[in-house]
């Protein structure tokens, strides 16, 4: 149970997503830390509780009492909270945190990629511990901001990655670090994705205008992205292929297929990153395929490594 008595009320304009989430994120550092008694249970909330988020939410719920849940899709939200009849339901994470942030101890963020950072930022500035589904953020800048906030707030954070959570991957990384593969000089990783619509079949926004389904909070799905009319080509799931919402095959799968190599070879920052080949580029969706080369410098533990990524 949370020890703070602070309560904050916020009002939002329809399109003040970035200002509301980011500004509030950088304004709440005065909130006190939690103090737990021996018999107190964690107060749990979820943002994005359908699809993969349902697994994250259910796992988190095993460690405490669910008091709030948020999803832009009311149908998925209703399914996910059936086991938690006392949970307060929201379609807008800003409303959930502003109304219940002083009660929430820990939450998952498992939304579309482009709203990972705004939701996590706001929660972290309230002192809420967060589990954010991969990829961590939509941009590198956002990831750096989350790292800064985590240090300042001294809270627990984790990026969700199923493979990394398994003993097999961690043991494999230990094997590589112990020299089991000898001197690693090259790494090749790949994925058959995309398995969702994007280039070359989808390169423009749909011209058709659809009515927003009654169960969908379209404004909250759009979040910090530029507003556009609703179409079923965007959600659920299909947002992965759109620049405004997803991170393409690289963001969706590289967290999985490259992580063993990154952990085992202790890779950090590359010295060069080169897109050596790709399908045609357009302004709306990711290319149908790509090849990317990365160079990692030598360290006191190993020599330089050339990393090759293939998708499509």
Task: For the regions a language model picked out, list residue spans one by one.
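Structural recognition of the beta-strand scaffold that forms the well-ordered cores
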Residues: 43-47, 67-71, 108-109, 131-132, ...
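A contiguous active-site-proximal alpha/beta segment in oxidoreductase catalytic domains
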Residues: 129-131, 137-220
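N-terminal Rossmann-like dinucleotide-binding module
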Residues: 20-84, 163-166, 176, 261
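Short, solvent-exposed loop/turn and secondary-structure capping segments
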Residues: 55-60, 79-82, 117-122, 142-143, ...
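Contiguous beta-strand/loop segments that form the cofactor/metal-binding neighborhood of enzyme cores
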Residues: 171, 183, 188-194, 198-312
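Loop/turn elements at helix/coil->beta-strand transitions in domains of secreted/extracellular proteins
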Residues: 41-42, 64-66, 85-86, 102-106, ...
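N-terminal secretory signal peptides and thylakoid transit peptides that target proteins
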Residues: 3-24
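Beta-loop-alpha module in the N-terminal Rossmann-like domain of NAD(P)-dependent dehydrogenases
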Residues: 87-145
């Amino acid at each position: 149970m949370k020890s703070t008595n602070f309560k904050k009320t916020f009002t939002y304009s329809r399109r003040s997503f970035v200002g509301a989430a980011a500004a509030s994120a950088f304004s709440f550092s005065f909130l006190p830390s939690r103090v737990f008694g021996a018999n107190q249970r964690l107060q749990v909330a979820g943002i994005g509780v359908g699809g993969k988020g349902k697994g994250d939410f259910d796992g988190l719920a095993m460690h405490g009492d669910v008091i709030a849940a948020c999803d832009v899709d009311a149908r998925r939200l209703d399914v996910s909270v059936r086991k938690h009849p006392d949970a307060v339901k929201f379609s807008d994470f800003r409303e959930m945190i502003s109304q219940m942030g002083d009660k929430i101890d820990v939450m998952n963020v498992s939304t579309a990629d482009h709203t990972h950072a705004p939701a996590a930022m706001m929660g972290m500035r309230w002192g809420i511990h967060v589990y954010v589904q991969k990829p961590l953020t939509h941009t590198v800048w956002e990831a750096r901001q989350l790292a800064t906030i985590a240090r300042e707030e001294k809270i627990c954070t984790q990026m969700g990655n199923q493979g990394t959570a398994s003993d097999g991957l961690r043991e494999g990384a230990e094997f590589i670090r112990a020299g089991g593969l000898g001197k690693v000089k090259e790494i090749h990783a790949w994925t058959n994705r995309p398995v969702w619509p994007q280039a070359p079949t989808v390169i423009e926004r749909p011209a058709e205008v659809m009515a927003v389904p009654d169960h969908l909070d379209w404004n909250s799905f759009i979040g910090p992205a530029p507003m556009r009319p609703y179409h079923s080509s965007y959600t659920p799931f299909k947002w992965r292929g759109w620049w405004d919402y997803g991170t393409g095959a690289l963001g969706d799968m590289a967290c999985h297929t490259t992580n063993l190599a990154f952990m085992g070879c202790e890779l950090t920052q590359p010295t060069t990153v080169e897109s050596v080949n790709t399908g045609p580029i357009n302004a709306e969706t990711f290319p149908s395929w790509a090849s990317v080369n990365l160079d990692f410098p030598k360290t006191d533990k190993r020599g330089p490594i050339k990393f090759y990524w293939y998708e499509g």
